[in-house]
Amino acid sequence: MIDYKSLGLSEEDLKVIYKWMDLGRKIDERLWLLNRAGKIPFVVSGQGQEATQIGMAYALEEGDITAPYYRDLAFVTYMGISAYDTFLSAFGKKDDVNSGGKQMPSHFSSRAKNILSQSSPVATQIPHAVGAALALKMDGKKKIATATVGEGSSNQGDFHEGLNFAGVHKLPFVCVIINNKYAISVPDSLQYAAEKLSDRALGYGIHGEQVDGNDPLAMYKAMKEARERAISDQGSTLIEAVTSRMTAHSSDDDDQYRTKEEREALKKADCNEKFKKELLSAGIIDDAWLAEIEAEHKDIINKATKAAEDAPYPSVEEAYAFVYEEGSLN
């Protein structure tokens, strides 16, 4: 484990980081159970990526703008999208904070939390976040904009256009490629020939680095340093977080393109289990503390699930709400 004290973190910080990683995982696991029970139609999972997500989130400051991608459940949970909010979205209920029950699950959005609305076409959030970074720079605010994408998105035109613009204008922008080595069923060997995707930063004139995405402290360090550069007028950063996708692409995907041995190896590399063992070994947490957290998160999720399931669906009359501006043509 990285020397957390050198990062300005305390033992309490590490416990908080683990708690959010665990809550994100538990919400994710409940979504899968609801899907398999036939209660919700679709799940796209972030299991195995919680270390990257919470490490990144923990380094951000209030007022920063984020453009997450669909696997960033733990990230948006930390940013303020509650378990109840997530289940409302999964059930397609009226009070879904993302879209009022209109958008697909895991298409996060919250003006109050500075979370830009997620689109289904991948990489489109990069130009959106770069535009937000431009606005922050023009307004003279010491804040940053971030976008996260999977490694498959790094081959999209929006990726190049956004990072090129960010580099030219030295914007306070950080792009995180969460490299879980699969774009649905396409392995990384068929996605790119470079040794590191972070090396692409050189062509944009920005800082680039590859980090261990299974280590929340490594991710925290990289994002904290990137943020400091950004607010100090040193331009943008491209971070490649190498991590794992422990599930199929989604609940509609057959994961047979990965061997049984490969899937088993992913479980052994579980970032949550790895970090938990490190904290136990260091004496920062113990079994009693873990049992308390387990009970707390189980209670949160059970209550949120029931409340969301019992919540009303949108009415037919609300079909066009938030689609067209209300009012007369005169």
Region annotations inferred by a language model:
Residues Y70, A241-T243, V323:
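A general secondary-structure junction signal
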Residues M1-T52, A59-L60, M246-T247, S251-Q256, ...:
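Conserved acidic/glycine
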Residues M1, P105-H107, I206, Q210, ...:
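Generic preference for hydrophobic/aromatic residues in regular secondary structure cores
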Residues K26-E29, L33-H169, P187-A193, S198, ...:
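Cofactor-binding active-site loop characterized by glycine-rich and histidine/acidic residues
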Residues N114-D310:
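Glycine-rich ThDP/TPP pyrophosphate-binding loop and its adjacent helix/strand module
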Residues Y4, R25, D95-K102, I239, ...:
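N-proximal short alpha-helices
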